């Protein structure tokens, strides 16, 4: 049986309306056990200022972003279940959900799935990687009872 341990950190000023710890746990449980038996993940919910600072420092992008993934890399010869950290910006997630006419809960779930796949080594730098990652995201979201997060883009094509 797989086990995903969640460390949820609420670093944003307003906690009202945020998904609860059980929801974040369910979303992690929907993705990570498909790839590894044990994992520890920190999810830190932040405001735009912290997201902006981290995005600028680590990605060179001068704006806040929806989710940042920081995979843990253990020193050689040491095995630990620590998968890494997800930094999710509340305001960006809420704004994107509204702009994209997506249910807010579904967009939160998508950000956890998307970020978790980054922690597991997936990326979307080139078209083939993006297609593989988006396909996995869609499969996982559908399995958890949500719509395809890319349906609007697919319809537009």
Swiss-Prot record:
GO terms for molecular function: metalloendopeptidase activity; RNA endonuclease activity; zinc ion binding. It is an enzyme of class 3 (hydrolase). Zn(2+) binds at residues 114, 118, 124. It comes from Salmonella dublin (strain CT_02021853). One of its GO terms (cellular component) is cytoplasm. PANTHER family: ENDORIBONUCLEASE YBEY, CHLOROPLASTIC. NCBIfam families: rRNA maturation RNase YbeY. It is found in: Cytoplasm. SUPFAM superfamilies: Metalloproteases ('zincins'), catalytic domain. Belongs to the endoribonuclease YbeY family. Its EC number is 3.1.-.-. Its cofactor is Zn(2+). This is Endoribonuclease YbeY. GO terms for biological process: rRNA processing. Single strand-specific metallo-endoribonuclease involved in late-stage 70S ribosome quality control and in maturation of the 3' terminus of the 16S rRNA. Its main location: cytoplasm. The keyword rRNA processing applies. Keywords: Cytoplasm, Endonuclease, Hydrolase, Metal-binding, Nuclease, Ribosome biogenesis, rRNA processing, Zinc. Binds 1 zinc ion.
